[in-house]
């Protein structure tokens, strides 16, 4: 029998701090086959190219980062693009600015999944629309993953309780809101991550005056399945 504390640690794992010699700080949250990293990159800092067996996806939350995947380098500004580094593909980054950069990276290796990417490894915004009245969302899509940036309006804006076949992970990147998974509720603040497995009931409500913002990742895509199928057909 799991205690309330056990359930909270399952759905909202306590992040562990990783400090690197170059000054980069990362807060790591893990459930199962997936790790969420919230990274703080100091000004004029280089993250040397490296590779690993996991796929890695990411985006910049604050600031500007020069990101290299394979032999492709692109400047990434906050929430304007995402990258995919497939398994064993070298990737690194450099903060060339005078400001600290905050980025989110997700590492994953799950049996049965195939990790495709665009030829240049970077995803542009696919579309922006209202998911619910007043809740604007922006999507980045590849055939096995969908990234959704969501604004939850203040003063009671909510994502009603629901469940689906997709695995869902989310990170609060602005404001705050209450997130509940299978009856376990946590106050989401900047950097808090949640992990929701398929068919686990979940919902969110913003009781604050200001809008909140979150990054939500779906495996496989939930809202843009047709786009994903077209990408899959193109690859085959």
Swiss-Prot record:
Catalytic activity field: 3-[(4R)-4-hydroxycyclohexa-1,5-dien-1-yl]-2-oxopropanoate = 3-[(1E,4R)-4-hydroxycyclohex-2-en-1-ylidene]pyruvate
E.C. no: 5.3.3.19
The protein's name: H2HPP isomerase
InterPro entries (UniProt xref): Bacilysin_H2HPP_isomerase (IPR052535), Cupin_2 (IPR013096), RmlC-like_jellyroll (IPR014710), RmlC_Cupin_sf (IPR011051)
GO BP field: antibiotic biosynthetic process
Species in which this protein is naturally found: Bacillus subtilis
Function description: Part of the bacABCDEF operon responsible for the biosynthesis of the nonribosomally synthesized dipeptide antibiotic bacilysin, composed of L-alanine and L-anticapsin. Bacilysin is an irreversible inactivator of the glutaminase domain of glucosamine synthetase. BacB catalyzes the allylic isomerization of the endocyclic-delta(4),delta(8)-7R-dihydro-hydroxyphenylpyruvate (en-H2HPP) to generate a mixture of 3E,7R- and 3Z, 7R-olefins of the exocyclic-delta(3),delta(5)-dihydro-hydroxyphenylpyruvate (ex-H2HPP).
Residues the record lists as binding substrate: 223
Positions that bind a divalent metal cation 2: 162, 164, 168, 202
Compartments, record wording: Cytoplasm
């Amino acid at each position: 029998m799991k205690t309330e504390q056990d359930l909270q640690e399952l759905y909202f794992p306590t992040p562990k701090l990783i400090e690197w010699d170059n000054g980069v700080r990362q807060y790591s949250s893990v459930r199962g086959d997936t790790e969420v990293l919230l990274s703080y990159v100091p000004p004029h800092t280089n993250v040397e190219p490296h590779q690993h067996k996991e796929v890695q996806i990411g985006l910049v939350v604050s600031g500007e980062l020069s990101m290299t995947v394979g032999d492709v380098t692109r400047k990434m500004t906050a929430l304007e693009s995402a990258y995919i580094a497939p398994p064993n593909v070298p990737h690194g980054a450099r903060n060339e600015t005078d400001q600290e950069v905050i980025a989110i990276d997700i590492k994953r290796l799950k049996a049965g999944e195939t990790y495709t990417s665009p030829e240049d490894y970077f995803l542009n915004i696919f579309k922006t629309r209202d998911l619910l009245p007043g809740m604007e969302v922006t999507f980045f899509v590849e055939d096995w993953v969908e990234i959704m940036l969501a604004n939850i309006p203040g003063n009671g804006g909510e994502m009603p309780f629901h469940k689906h076949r997709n695995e869902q992970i989310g990170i609060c990147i602005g404001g705050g809101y209450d997130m509940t998974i299978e009856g376990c509720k946590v106050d989401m603040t900047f950097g808090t991550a949640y992990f929701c497995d398929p068919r686990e009931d979940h919902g969110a409500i913003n009781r604050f005056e200001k809008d909140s913002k979150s990054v939500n990742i779906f495996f496989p895509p939930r809202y843009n399945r047709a786009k994903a199928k077209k990408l899959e057909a193109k690859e085959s």
